[in-house]
Regions:
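C-terminal target-recognition/interaction regions appended to catalytic cores
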Residues: 164-261
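Flexible, glycine-/basic-rich loop-and-beta segments that form/coincide
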Residues: 103-161
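Mobile active-site "lid"/loop adjacent to the S-adenosyl-L-methionine
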Residues: 19-39
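Short, conserved secondary-structure transition motifs
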Residues: 94-102
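Short catalytic/ligand-binding loop motif for oxyanion handling, primarily in non-cytosolic enzymes
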Residues: 16-20, 66-71, 118
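Conserved Class I SAM-dependent methyltransferase catalytic core
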Residues: 37-94, 109
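S-adenosyl-L-methionine
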Residues: 1-5
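Internal, well-ordered alpha/beta segment that forms a basic, Gly-enriched binding/recognition surface
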Residues: 8-19, 50, 58-59
C-alpha cells in the first residue's frame, strides 16, 4: 500500500476483553503484538491498526461501549484524534448470537479520516440511531455515577449502613447482585446519606426488563429531582420488592419512547 493510495477498510474484527473473567479459559494465550497496538481488547487493537494504516474511510462493526464509555474512549485516543464518526446504526449482538445469555449493543460505524478528530463531548452530544428507528443522545440523560460511588470505597466511608456490590453498566447490573450482607473485595460501603440512591439502583434492577438493549453499556439513568419526590417510595420498594404505580410511571417517563414493554 502506497501513501498516495486511497484506502477504505470494511470489516467486523474480533473483539473480546482479555481481562474479563467471562469465557476466560479461551483467552489465556499470549501472542506477540506491536507495542503501538497492544490493548486489553482485540477489537481496540484493530482500530488502532487502522489508524496506523491511515485509512481514508473505515466502516466497521464494534461494541458501542468503545464510544460511550469514557474509559474506553481514552484508550482509543490515538484513533479518535484522527477520525470522525460520520454515520452509524446500532444493532443487537443477538443477531449474531441468538442463543447467548446476554446481548449487548453493536455499532456499525462509518469513520472518515479527519485531522481534528473527535472528543468525548462529541460523543455525549451525538444522536445515535438504532436499527429499530430509535434515536438517543447521552446528554439527554442524567446518570447515577454523578451521585454515588460505584466501586469499592471502604477507604473513604466509615459510617456504612449497608453494602452494595460493585456497579458497572446496565448489562452488568442485569446479572450482578445489589445489596450484599457479606463484605468482600467488590463491596461498596453505603453511607446513610446515600442509602436511598442505592435503593434506587436496586429498584432499577427490578424494572430492568423495560430498558432496551441499546442502553446496555450505559450507566444507570436517573431523574434526580423526580427521584427525590419519590425517595421514600424507592426505599420501600427496595425492601418489599413491590413497585407501586408511581414508581412504574417514573421509569416510563424516564425512558420515554425507549421504554420497552
Amino acid at each position: 500500500i502506497y501513501n498516495s493510495d486511497k484506502l477504505i477498510i470494511i470489516g467486523n474484527p474480533p473483539y473480546n476483553d482479555k481481562t474479563s473473567i467471562v469465557q476466560n479459559h479461551i483467552k489465556n494465550k499470549n501472542y506477540e503484538v506491536d507495542v503501538n497496538l497492544k490493548c486489553r481488547d482485540l477489537g481496540m487493537s484493530f482500530l488502532l491498526s487502522f489508524n496506523e494504516l491511515k485509512a481514508d474511510y473505515i466502516c466497521i462493526l464494534h461494541p458501542l461501549s468503545y464510544l460511550i464509555k469514557n474509559a474506553n474512549f481514552k484508550i482509543l485516543k490515538k484513533f479518535f484524534s484522527n477520525y470522525k464518526l460520520i454515520d452509524s446504526v446500532i444493532i443487537s449482538s443477538q443477531i449474531f448470537c441468538p442463543y447467548s445469555l446476554g446481548f449487548f449493543p453493536i455499532i456499525i460505524a462509518l469513520y472518515e479520516k479527519n485531522e481534528k478528530g473527535i472528543n468525548y463531548d462529541f460523543i455525549k452530544n451525538y444522536n445515535f440511531k438504532t436499527i429499530d428507528d430509535k434515536i438517543f443522545c447521552l446528554n439527554d440523560f442524567d446518570f447515577i455515577s454523578k451521585y454515588i460511588d460505584k466501586y469499592p470505597n471502604k477507604n473513604r466511608v466509615s459510617d456504612k449502613v449497608a453494602m452494595f456490590y460493585t456497579m458497572r453498566d446496565i448489562n452488568a447490573l442485569r446479572r450482578s447482585k445489589t445489596f450484599i450482607k457479606k463484605d468482600c473485595a467488590n463491596a461498596v460501603y453505603v453511607p446513610k446519606s446515600k442509602y436511598s440512591l442505592y435503593c434506587y439502583v436496586d429498584v432499577f434492577k427490578q424494572n430492568i426488563k423495560t430498558v432496551p438493549y441499546y442502553f446496555g453499556n450505559c450507566d444507570i439513568m436517573i431523574d434526580y429531582n423526580k427521584f427525590k419526590i419519590l425517595e421514600k417510595d424507592f426505599i420501600k420498594a427496595s425492601k418489599s420488592k413491590i413497585l407501586n404505580s408511581k414508581i412504574l410511571d417514573y421509569f416510563e417517563n424516564l425512558l420515554g419512547e425507549h421504554y420497552a414493554n
